[in-house]
Amino acid sequence: MEKENQIFGIRAIIEAINAGKEIDKVFIQSDAQGELMQELMKAMKKHSINFSYVPVEKLNRLTPNNHQGAVATIAPITFVKLETLVDAVVESGKTPLFLILDQLSDARNFGAIIRTAECTGVDGIIVQKTGSAPVNGDTVKTSAGAVFNVPICKVDHIKDAIFYLQGSGIKTVAATEKTEDTIYTIALNEPVAIIMGSEDRGINPSVLKIVDEKAKLPMFGTIGSLNVSVACGAFLYETVRQRQ
C-alpha cells in the first residue's frame, strides 16, 4: 500500500469521510472499541464505505505510525456519478458501451479489466461501493495507467444502476453460464452494458433476474471456466467485432 494513499488514526479518517474524500476501504483493528470507534462506524455506514476487521499486526505492517486501530486507503482517482456519465454518453450520439462489475474483489483482476476496457472503448465502469476491489496501487499498475482514462462509477446497489441504464435505453447483458445463448448470438452492436460477476460466485441471482439478456462463452476443454478478466476481454472484443 502506498503511504501517500493512506490515512491513519480514527479522528483523521472520520474527518476525511466527512470532507468527502474518496475512501476505498478502512481496515479496523478486530478488538477496537470506544466512542470514537463507534463514531467512525456510523460515518462509514452512512457513506457506504467498505471496511474489514484485521489483526493489529496487519495495521502495524501498513503503517509504523500511531494508527489508533484504524487505517484507510484513499482512491488515486475521482469517481464519477452514474447519472452524469450515462446522460453524457447517451447525449453524445455515440453507441454506449458500459461495463458493470458485480462485486469483483481482486484488485489485479480489476486492473486487467480496466486495461482491456480502455483498449476496447468502454465508456465507463460501474462497481458497487461495498464488496468490490479497491482502486489501489495494484489496480493502477495492472491497468498500465488505464485507470486514469476510463470513468469509474461507484453505486450503492448494482440493481439500481441496471434499472437506470435500462431506463436510458441501454440493454443489459449478463455474462453467465446459466443460459443456452452464447455471446455470438447476442446483438452487441447497440447501446449495451455488459455485466461480469465476482471471481468465486459469479453474478448475483437477484441481478440475473432483472437483466435483459444472458450470454456465455462456449467452452471446449475440461476446465469449466475462465479467469474473469479473460472472459471480460472476450466479451468486449466480440462487442468491438460486431461494431466494426
Where are these regions (language model features)?
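RNA substrate-binding interface of SAM-dependent RNA methyltransferases
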Residues: E15-K21, D87-D181
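Glycine- and other small-residue-rich loops at beta-strand/loop junctions that grip anionic moieties
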Residues: N5, Q29, D102-Q103, Q128, ...
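N-terminal positively charged helical leader segments and presequences
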Residues: M1-A88
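Surface-exposed amphipathic alpha-helices with a cationic face
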Residues: K45, I162-Q166, V240
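Short, acidic/turn-prone active-site loops that include or flank metal/cofactor-
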Residues: D31-A32, V56-E57, T130-S132, E199-R201, ...
